[in-house]
């Protein structure tokens, strides 16, 4: 089957790496997720990955800590996750290169668009850590930013649900799943796709978002080939 997308930016939440508990690294889960990424990579698609940090730290739950400091700790958590994902992919025989938005040359080179594109053109998966490098911005926004910067065809948001619903499907059995959505409806109805900053950036740059379930990591390869997976959000 032909590829629907030639270059994707994949967002993986930190909690996903933690397995059922959502904390730390769950080795079987990490194996499965990276195995799914490998299958997509073998199809010939160029891949960039942004990883969240919620399996180690959530700035919004940091109590009385000053928000800027809490977010900096969260950025460091995403770097740890980027290194772990990169290492697992390398173990599976997939070449990678890690880039950080925070200057830490002993760990990984700083992100530049030129270097990220060079890595992907060389067949490597570019793994981005450190969020945007600034407080008050989510890793969803970091994913949207990197996707726009590297001219990705689509942003993949791999989650714990199989798409976007009109209300929480875990709480409401009658929740309706959308196959497609416009950014206008997402923003007007405040649907739980991502924060408004990220959604607006994608809308303004005509970057579609595909939201799908990571419980089956093969969904990544299916989505790359254009199979009916998850919910597609686009600028209608």
Language-model features: where?
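C-terminal catalytic "cap/lid" subdomain
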Residues: 1-236
């Amino acid at each position: 089957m032909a590829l629907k997308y030639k270059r994707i930016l994949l967002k993986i939440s930190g909690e996903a790496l933690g397995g059922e508990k959502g904390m730390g690294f769950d080795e079987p889960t990490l194996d499965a997720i990276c195995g799914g990424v490998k299958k997509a990579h073998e199809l010939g698609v160029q891949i960039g990955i942004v990883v969240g940090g919620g399996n180690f730290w959530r700035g919004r739950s940091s109590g009385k800590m000053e928000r800027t400091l809490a977010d900096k700790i969260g950025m460091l958590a995403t770097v740890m996750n980027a290194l772990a994902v990169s290492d697992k992919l390398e173990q599976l025989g997939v070449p990678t290169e890690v880039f950080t938005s925070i200057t830490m040359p002993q760990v990984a080179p700083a992100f530049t668009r030129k270097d990220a594109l060079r890595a992907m053109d060389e067949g490597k998966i570019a793994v981005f850590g450190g969020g945007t490098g600034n407080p008050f911005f989510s890793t969803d926004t970091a994913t949207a930013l990197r996707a726009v910067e590297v001219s990705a065809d689509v942003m993949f948001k791999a989650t714990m649900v199989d798409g976007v619903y009109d209300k929480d499907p875990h709480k409401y059995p009658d929740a309706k799943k959308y196959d497609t959505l416009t950014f206008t409806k997402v923003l007007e109805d405040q649907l739980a796709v991502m924060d408004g900053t990220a959604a607006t950036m994608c809308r303004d740059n005509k970057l579609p978002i595909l939201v799908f379930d990571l419980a089956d990591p093969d969904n990544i390869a299916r989505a790359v080939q254009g199979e009916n997976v998850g919910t597609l959000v686009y600028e209608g």
